Amino acid sequence: MVMTDGWIVAPPRVRLLVCGAADRGDDGAALVAAATLLPALSEAQRTLLEVRRCGQLDVDDLVGMPDGLAGLIIDVAIGVPPGTIVALSFDRLVAGDGAVGPRSSHALPVSQVLGLADALGHLPRGTFVGIGGRRFGFGQGLSRVVRAAMPAYRDAILVEIERLAT
């Protein structure tokens, strides 16, 4: 518990890691989702979150997370059809259980970053929620298919926030 202006505030339960680049087409999908989802959350829902914009996911974003704090990575994914939404647990991504999993559009795939955190003994409970992207060129906006899927992407993120917070 944390004391703020005389009020006792519970610590956040979910670290929301918002990945992507706004100037790289569909790579900015998670930024758009967060920018439109967060203001629509209730005060109670917002207090559950610690939000970090990470651009490219790094193992430092996960190492040292306090016990009880779950991770939620949102990012665009390649390797899944454009506009398709995927939600995979960190454990499943690390295990590489043979299922086709998304890869971040960044240099180091999400599964490898999670694997590093696991090797260091710091893999938190958590989920990756991605949306398949189509174009990633500099200066491009979101593709039509990603824009059309944005409401469902925000809904999937909210479902995971609520699930991980319990």
Predicted features and spans:
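N-terminal catalytic or cofactor-binding beta/alpha core of small enzyme domains
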Residues: V2-L123, F128-G133, Q140-A152, L158-T166
